[in-house]
Structures are given as C-alpha cells and as structure tokens.
Amino acid sequence: MYLAMPVILYRLAFRGLRNRGYFSRWLERFGWFRDPSFESSIWVHAVSVGEFNAAIPLIQELMRRHPDLPMVVTTITPTGSDRVLKQFGARVFHVYLPYDLPAAIERFFARIKPRIAVVMETEIWPNLYFACREHQIPIFIANARLSERSMRGYGPAMSLITEAVRCASLVAAQSQIDAERFLQLGAARDRVCVVGNIKFDMAVPDGLHEIAREWRQAWGALRPVWIAASTHEGEESAVLQAHARILGRFPDALMILVPRHPERFRAAISLCRSYGFRTSCRSEDQIAALDSQCFVVDTMGELLKFYMCADACFVGGSLDRIGGHNVLEPAALCKPILIGPYTFNFAEITDTLVGENAAIRVANGAELGTQVIRVLSDGKRALAMGRAALAVVERERGAVPRTMLAIEAILSDSPTSARH
C-alpha cells in the first residue's frame, strides 16, 4: 500500500480541485488528529451522505443504550462529514477514516480504541479489517449490500478481499441476493444473515408537510412540479430535454434539479440556462420565483424537503450507468417515482416498486418526459402510485431493531476494551 502513496496523494489533490473540502483536514486521512483520550468507544463508519443517513437511527439507538461509551463516526467524503456535524455536532467524535495504510490505521485505533466497528454497506478495506482482527475488534457490516458490478470490480484483488471479509464477525445483509454474494466472496455462512434494508425504517421529519405547503404556495400553488434528484453529469442533458417536452404540455411546470455532487452545482445551473430555461437556485434565491422553469438545489441536506414538494420524482444515477440512488426516500413520502434503466445498486427494491406499480422505468430522456407528463396529467394515477410506494416501505420496515439485536449480541460478547 505504501507504494501507492503517490497515487493516493494525486487522487486527493485531484478531488480537491473539484471539491475544496478535500483540501481540509488532510492529516486525519493519515491517522493524525487530536487524541480524544477514550478508554473505549463505539465506532460507526459511513462513506458518505447516503450511508450516513441510513446509519442515523443505529447511531441514535446505540447512543441511547450506551451513554457511557463515546460514539465515533467516520466518513470519507467532505459532504458526509458536513452531514455528520450538522446532525450530531459535538455529541459524536467525528474524523475522516484514514487511508488503508497500516501505520495510519494503528494511529487511528490508538486514539479511538473501538470496542466494535459498525461498517455501513460495502466498505471493505483489507488492512483495516486485518487490523481489527489483530486487535480483536469485532466488525459488524450493517445494511450490507454487494452488487454484481462490485463483485467484478474486485478482479485481481479478490483473494485479498475474501480474506478481509472473513474477518467480519457478522454481515447483516439487506437481501438474500446480497447475502449470497457475500457468501460467494468468502464470508462464513454462520456469519451472514438477512435483516432487511435499514433505509425502509426512515422516519419522516416533523414539519416536512408544512414546509412543502409553504413553498408550493410561494412557487404558485397550482403549477405542476417535478424533481430530478441525485443527477449526474451524463444524464442532466437528458433530464433537461425531458423538461422541455413537459413544458410543451404544461407551460408553467417547474423542475427542481438536485445534482448528486456539490462540484456539479455551478455546471448544472449553467447547463439549465444554456437550454434557455429561466433558472434560479437555492443558494441565491432561496425559493423558486413564480416565473422560474428550473430551480437548482445547490445546497446539501435538503433533498427530503424538495421531494415532499414534488408531484413526481425522478431518482437519478439511473439514466447513466451509475446504478441508481435511494428510491426509498420518495417512496416513504408517498410520491410517484420514475427511474432509468440502470438501477443495479438497488435492483431488488426498484424491481419491487416497478412490479407493484409504484414506480415507472424509462429508457431515456424522451420517455422520461412522456411519463412525467402522464403522471402530472392523472392525479388519481399519481396518488395510487404514491400509496403503492408507501405500502412497500411500510411492509418492509423493521431492519433497525433486527440490526440492533445483532449488534448488541456482539457487544455483549466483546471485551470491555479492545487490545491495543
């Protein structure tokens, strides 16, 4: 891994050029940070915003059950870091996860002294896992998922990944398909279980309906509104072409565009204007003007508010080969959902929603425009789709208590403090 140091530094610098947040707190990524002087702690790792949002109920419940143990939360991305600090502030100890370098990991462990490592979804770092095994720190992979694309991506490193996965005390998989893939990866059968997807347990924040009602009134209460959320560079042109088609049917329609990554914000605003759309943005205008045709959300942490405002919700990362993003947020808000053809990151969930007439799968931007028009034109159909989506969410709830039961079983068997 040390031979890869030039590549690591280059990637960090490259990302910093796109997102200035990567230029901050470099030392944390090498295990250098203020020693909190913990005797023991509970450590939860979530790579970025989506994984952290899923981890919130687990973190809250762990803090409630173990008030005597400090809570450590790590992320990799600056946006994930911002979300942690906004949600918990000083109630948790937050740093970036160090690079997968033995010395950096040793410094990290020496400072936080974790009693357990709760790793969200698909974060498998060989040196980190080997160090956990060496220090007798149980690894719990929560909300575990593994796509076919991820399996293929391990390639020549497969044997190393297999050895790392075997270090896990328990893999709590989202689905039977995910469980089978972890078994194929080499996880021990008695250390893999299916608990469901924690994201089904999302709680709708208080006051969300009131905020949406106020904003819709300010935008023009009767105008149709749709949202294109978590979009990527390769699909935003298709989304804007869809909106042009929608405006042909609904001249007063408003599209809310929410780029997935902050470094895309300014480019997305420019792209909307290049199509000739009257465009406003959240950071400058706060709310969409009555004559706005596009409203770009160039802030973080507000996606649920804008989902609640929409009459139809397109979830991005699915028109391009990204694999899709979280469709359960609009589903939990009783919204009709549209997705593209590439949803392999959430294959089982999206197939269920489509199969139960809660979501519509489209092939391209032209079809997206056509289907959004149909949803906006038929209030009864939109309501039925939203209710079907919510029914799927309600039926699948319960992963958080099942996950907590498994974590508590491991904690009760683990030593009071790990060996450092």
Regions found by a protein language model. Name each.
Residues M1-H420:
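Nucleotide-activated sugar donor-binding and catalytic core shared by glycosyltransferases
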